[in-house]
Amino acid sequence: MPVVEVKLWDLERLTGASLDESTVRDLLPRLKCEVEEVSGEDVVYEATHDRPDLYSAELLSVYLKGLLGVEDGLPRPRVGSAEGVAEVEGPAYRPYAFFAVVRGVSLDDEAIRQLMQLQEKVHLTYGRNRRKVSIGLYDLDGIKLPVRYVAASPETRMKPLGFAIEMTLREVLEKHPKGVEYGHLVKGHGEYPLIVDAEGKVVSFPPITNSEDFRVTESTRDVLIDVTSTDPEAGRRIISLFAHAVAVRGGEVRPLRLKGALDEESPRMEPEEVVYDVSMNRDLLGLDLGVEETVRLLRAMRMDAEPAGNGKVAVRYPYFRVDILHPVDIAEEVAMGYGYERIEPAVIPPLHPGREDPIEVFTRALREGMVGLGFVEVNNYMMTSASLMFDAMLLPRQPIVEVENPRHEAYHALRTWIVPQLLRLMSSSKHAGYPQRVFEAGDVAIPDESRDNRVREERRLAFAVAGKGVTLTDGLAALKGLFRQLGVSFKLEKAEHPSFIAGRVARVVTEAGDAGIVGEVHPQVLVNFGLEVPVVAGELNVEVVMKCYLARLGGA
């Protein structure tokens, strides 16, 4: 979780309340923040990934005001008249830009540090390392409105942040630290994102760096904020978040009218609305809290709330609250306002007794079956190398799950199949004599963009038989013996696979679909592993075989 550092004295001046270590340690956990350290004026805490509004002192102080009883209800920054328009005609791969002006802020070194911290923490988390969202803050003095978000030539020149000389955008990607770090987000495209003012002066090269000419300093009184994004909803919420945060430092928000990719006013300052049924207090929290108490607690959590009749509450919450997706999230706010420490734990009887996962039960049966067929079980690490899985097996490289900074080249990726590791084991066991019959039941990891975590895990059963005179028949005999024990039928279909001899390899097909492959290992693969006898190997998808087995039981 993001680690945030704030100053106690800064929180005191923003809240208008006296704070000490005890108060901080009491209140921050009620905002789902884990206090790591309070040392003198330094407060260090962890905030959750879904609460970017807690990544700096500005909005943290707003919530502390609610818990301390200083203020309640929605935070209401001053909002003035629109400043004009902003033209949005950026590159297609990063099409959206949102802007806000905040006038009359009062900044010192700590205020600037907090806003920069908020910017970087949002970049790393919600912004997906600037890929999804990037933010810029500028001294508006010297910028002539309206601003434009455009697609620019890589040869366009600017003075990047921290540099005293101008360079082309292409040079920024090569020489500026942020260009080196984030250049991959724009490299390969013919045009780069750029923000310029009405006179054509470069304000920013998002998502890389800002212009040195418009750096925010302690003398800055008017701030221009931009958010560029690949997702319009994400951009809207983050520009609203930053407008609120900067306004906490004493400013007035001035919207801009977007023209181009979107036609709307930015930032959005109006709240979201949801109707909350107070019966959820008991159902989810075990608390008997009526409408009036629920309203009071939600207002303390900096939301507007009022009775809506029939045991319901109309709730309005800040648009930048990206963590609120459902009335269940409002129940969490009620719990936070009430105080987690006041909720007494209760042991809830389980709805059903625990049980072993069916896949584990079935895998154990397969292990016993293979042992009964004369195989010896082995276990390999799930970590392996691409060279073993692909190069040694005569396969083209495919997407795999890799470790970013591996300690050892032999263990830099998660395996996508098990047979290569069995061959490696046989290679190191040549002294043990033949025939050798080994198997392993374990998991593999296959990249799959359709999954939430982009990885599909499969349980596999792999086996190998090595020895003089070993042929495909030996592999088929093992398969038939195993399937006969399960009472499951299968058939073989012609297959092609570079790791096996052509014409001596087959797909194993069941009623539930393809279950795996079996074949005689290709001579070149044997050479790659230093094996001097024929080997037949196979690998099955355990879940497919289990479906057939369970279907047979269901039909019995």
From Swiss-Prot:
Binding site for Mg(2+): D323, D329, E332, E333
Catalytic function, reaction form: tRNA(Phe) + L-phenylalanine + ATP = L-phenylalanyl-tRNA(Phe) + AMP + diphosphate + H(+)
Cofactor: Mg(2+)
GO biological process: phenylalanyl-tRNA aminoacylation
Cysteines paired by S-S bonds: none
Gene3D superfamilies: 3.30.56.10, Bira Bifunctional Protein, Domain 2, Phenylalanyl-trna Synthetase, Chain B, domain 3
Subcellular location: Cytoplasm
UniProt-listed Enzyme Commission number(s): 6.1.1.20
The keyword NADP belongs to this UniProt entry's keyword annotation: no
Record-annotated B5 domain positions: 269-345
Lineage: superkingdom: Archaea
GO cellular component: phenylalanine-tRNA ligase complex
CDD domains in alphabetical order: PheRS_beta_core
Chief location of this protein within or outside the cell: cytoplasm
Alphabetical keyword list: Aminoacyl-tRNA synthetase, ATP-binding, Cytoplasm, Ligase, Magnesium, Metal-binding, Nucleotide-binding, Protein biosynthesis
GO molecular function: ATP binding; magnesium ion binding; phenylalanine-tRNA ligase activity; RNA binding
Pfam families, per the entry: B3_4, B5, tRNA_synthFbeta
Enzyme class: ligase
InterPro entries: aa-tRNA-synth_II/BPL/LPL (IPR045864), B3/B4_tRNA-bd (IPR005146), DNA-bd_dom_put_sf (IPR009061), Phe-tRNA-ligase_IIc_bsu (IPR045060), Phe-tRNA-synth_IIc_bsu_arc_euk (IPR004531), Phe-tRNA_synthase-like_B3/B4 (IPR020825), Phe_tRNA_ligase_beta2_arc (IPR022918), PheRS_beta_core (IPR041616)
Family from the record: Belongs to the phenylalanyl-tRNA synthetase beta subunit family. Type 2 subfamily.
Subunit structure: Tetramer of two alpha and two beta subunits.
Protein name, entry field: Phenylalanine--tRNA ligase beta subunit
Organism listed in the record: Thermofilum pendens (strain DSM 2475 / Hrk 5)
Gene name, Swiss-Prot/TrEMBL: pheT
